[in-house]
Curated annotation (Swiss-Prot):
It comes from Methanocaldococcus vulcanius (strain ATCC 700851 / DSM 12094 / M7) (Methanococcus vulcanius). Its cofactor is a divalent metal cation. The gene is ribL. It is an enzyme of class 2 (transferase). Gene3D superfamilies: HUPs. This is FAD synthase. Belongs to the archaeal FAD synthase family. The keyword Flavoprotein applies.
Amino acid sequence: MEKDRNVKKRVITAGTFDILHPGHYEILKFAKSLGDELIVIIARDKTVERLKGRKPIIPENQRREMVEALKPVDKAILGSLNNKLEPILKLKPDIIVLGPDQMTFDEETLKKELEKHNLHPKIVRFKNYKKCPFHSSFDIVKEIVKRYCNKE
């Protein structure tokens, strides 16, 4: 994807976004505040299964559609099955926002990998998400199991 000349700053972030919760929305609002265009890379089902040892609950295309429907998001795309850097190399972002628990890359490793491709985006780690009872998809699933599956 070529950069649109009218876009001043392209921001990207990536994640699974399996069961949407306030933490997801907070990072998306933050990411959008850093630029003019926010593109979100949605992890593929097979990638999530490989990294987390379990399939996402919501299929990848539905997750992409839901994220793209959120106000801060200009576009959501599916990530690559083969190379996690591929969409970043195509999008050529000015800023990359990493989530607080996103450990696929640390900032320095990502920076060095992108420099090999002559890309020099600013890399920002989002740290100040709103604390709330269910700020992770895993916590939501645990609560559902507790409330509905442990009944006699």
